[in-house]
Structure formats: C-alpha cells, structure tokens
Amino acid sequence: MLSYYAFIFFAKIMEVALMTIRTVLITRGEKLYGSIIGFIEVTIWLYVTSSVLSGIKDDPIRMVVYALGFTCGNYMGCVIEEKLAIGLLTINVITSESDGKRLAEILRDENVGVTMVDAEGKIEQKKMLIIHAKRKRREEIIRTIEGSDINAMISVNDIKTVYGGYGIRK
C-alpha cells in the first residue's frame, strides 16, 4: 500500500511540474513543445486521477497524498522552470550620463548587446541602457552591472518575442 501512495505522490509531482513547464512554453510561443508536454501531462493526469477516485471512499488517504503531490509539483515545476530559463527578457538600466557610457562598454566587453538612449531625470541628464537577452543570462548580466561600482536603477521584464537584435537569436 505504501508503494501505491508513493506512486500517486510522485506521479502527481511529475504531472503538475509538466503542467507548469507546458504553460510557460505556450506563453512564450513554443506551441509544439508545449503541446507534446501537454499530451504526456494529460496521460499521467488521467491515470492517476482515475486510480485515486476509484477507491477514495475506502481509502481517503489517497486524496491527501494526491493533494500533497499537487503541492510539491507546483514547487518543483517552478524550480525546473527557473533552471531552464526559457525565453527572453529586457533589462532597463538607468544611470548617470557618464556612468552609462562606461557601463555600456563593460557590458559590450561581456558580449551583451546594449542600446543606449538619453533620458532625463529630476535633477540631471541620465542614460538608459536597454538590454534584450536570453533569460539564461539574467544573473550574469545583473552581476556584471552590480559589480561595476556604478550606481544604477535596474528593472527586468520578461518578454515574449524580439525580432532581430544582437546575440539572442534561437
């Protein structure tokens, strides 16, 4: 009986983790991969759900194990998605005019594509650096910015599509 509970628990974790990854893939425009994962996901769901529901009155622990698997699956799906880092992002950096030029140079030396535009702050002129990159490079780019000893305001946005650009083609 313990192995049956373990099966329900781990199968539900796998199903929900796949659901999380499928959702991310589809929202990022990866329809084919999302659909393939969806097929596997729903196959697992049908098997596990039908086996839990078939004897739930006689063995209500199945329901608890199923719910625990669901909870852990959500967590695991998020962890896996963070590791895969599928997709693209935009990093906007606002800094002083002189620091902006220096930071753009530092980033370009790290093979990061940077667009620099003039911006106007409350007190002084600023530079805004716009960076489009793969999500896998997020931490590396932010570490480079923070390690440059330049006072900068950084914002990061997930994006779905970028046409053209430097260093982000599939």
UniProtKB/Swiss-Prot annotation:
The chain crosses the membrane at residues 1-21, 36-56. GO terms for cellular component: plasma membrane. It is a multi-pass membrane protein. InterPro entries: DUF2179, DUF5698, UPF0316. Belongs to the UPF0316 family. HAMAP family: UPF0316. This is UPF0316 protein CBO0591/CLC_0646. It comes from Clostridium botulinum (strain Hall / ATCC 3502 / NCTC 13319 / Type A).
